[in-house]
Amino acid sequence: MTVFVIPEKRVAYIADLVTPNRVGFNIMPDFNIGEWERTLGEILELDFDVAVCSHTELSAEEAPGGCTKTHVEEERQFLLDLRGAIFAEFQKGTPADEIPTTVALPQYAEWVGYDEWLPMNAWRVMLDIWMGPYPWVPEG
């Protein structure tokens, strides 16, 4: 995905990389999860005050201000929390095919798509762990 900053406006364009107050869409079909996490970390290093992001579920009070670094951090934390919850289930011995419907992240329960998409997000992250990322990126 293309990310850029308009320095004189202190505005970043981050599109689908951050979707405030919303879990990842469906199975996140075209995302390399590890690279997404890395990219969100790099976005946090950019110099901007507000960002243009897609599929926002910001409240009427928040919407005029657009996305912020707080939203970037929340998106990144969601991915980290999801991965952590999956590993915790593995450690408990939960069968792999039960993990997506067992994982719960109550801190995100108010996010749009939580009930419908969280299990699909979990499947996607698990597949990334088991099979490697898509699209594949060569090392070095």
Pin down the residues of each PLM region.
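Metallo-beta-lactamase
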Residues: 9-16, 50, 130-139
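Solvent-exposed loop/turn segments at secondary-structure junctions
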Residues: 11, 17-20, 57-59, 105-107, ...
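C-terminal regulatory/interaction regions
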Residues: 91-140
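Alpha-helix capping and helix-loop boundary segments enriched in small/acidic/polar residues
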Residues: 27, 70-74, 113
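Divalent-metal (often Zn2+) His-rich catalytic cores of metallo-beta-lactamase-fold enzymes
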Residues: 5, 33-94, 98
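Catalytic core of the metallo-beta-lactamase
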Residues: 1-38, 42-45
